[in-house]
């Protein structure tokens, strides 16, 4: 191979490595803070404090359940935290929450449910699995198994807490 060709290939290789490095660093930086709306972020703090639930946990659930999209729907569950009006009709009435597509109402209903689960079960991974409708939640907990769902949320919660200086 000619010397000029080797130099060109070396430069091209270094450019690719540099580009990939910047892309990876940029991707990591992008995941450091939450991408939920400013209003949802504020509601997580307001409602989290009201229910004594870590606001970062609420943010992590929102990211996992809906990627921060208040109009998300899946199998009868709607909104940021994927709440089912069918299962939480009484809770919604009690809380005065009328629209699960409304960020505040959705977070309020979900936080109320999570608070109930935390009072009953205490263990975050178990609470998250039950919240997610995992029929094996109790068995997983008793066997010391943390689901990917719960693990992802707990990891993201810890990351957000670090970013927020906790």
What is the role of each PLM region?
Residues 2-43, 47-51, 69, 86-166:
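Non-catalytic cell-wall polysaccharide-engagement segments
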Residues 41-42, 55-59:
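Short amphipathic alpha-helical segments
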Residues 53-56, 75-78, 122:
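Extracytoplasmic
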Residues 60, 80-82, 127-130:
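Structural recognition of the beta-strand scaffold that forms the well-ordered cores
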Residues 62-77:
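Conserved alpha-helical segments that form or flank metal/cofactor-binding pockets of metalloenzymes
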Residues 74-76, 84-87:
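Solvent-exposed, flexible loop/coil residues
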Residues 77-80, 147-149:
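Glycine-rich, phosphate-binding/catalytic loops in enzymes
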């Amino acid at each position: 191979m000619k010397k000029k060709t080797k130099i060109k290939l070396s430069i091209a290789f270094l450019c690719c490595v540099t580009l990939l490095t910047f892309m990876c660093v940029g991707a990591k930086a992008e995941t450091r803070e939450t991408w939920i709306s400013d209003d949802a972020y504020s509601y997580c703090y307001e409602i989290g404090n009201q229910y004594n639930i870590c606001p970062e946990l609420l943010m992590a659930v929102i990211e996992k359940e809906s990627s921060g999209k208040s109009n998300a729907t899946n199998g009868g569950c709607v909104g940021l935290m994927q709440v089912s009006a069918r299962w939480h009709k009484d809770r919604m009435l009690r809380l005065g929450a009328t629209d699960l597509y409304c960020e505040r109402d959705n977070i309020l209903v979900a936080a109320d449910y999570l608070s109930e689960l935390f009072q009953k079960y205490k263990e975050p991974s178990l609470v998250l699995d039950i919240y997610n409708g995992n029929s094996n939640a109790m068995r997983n907990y008793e066997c010391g198994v943390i689901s990917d769902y719960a693990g992802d949320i707990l990891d993201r919660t810890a990351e957000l807490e670090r970013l927020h200086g906790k």
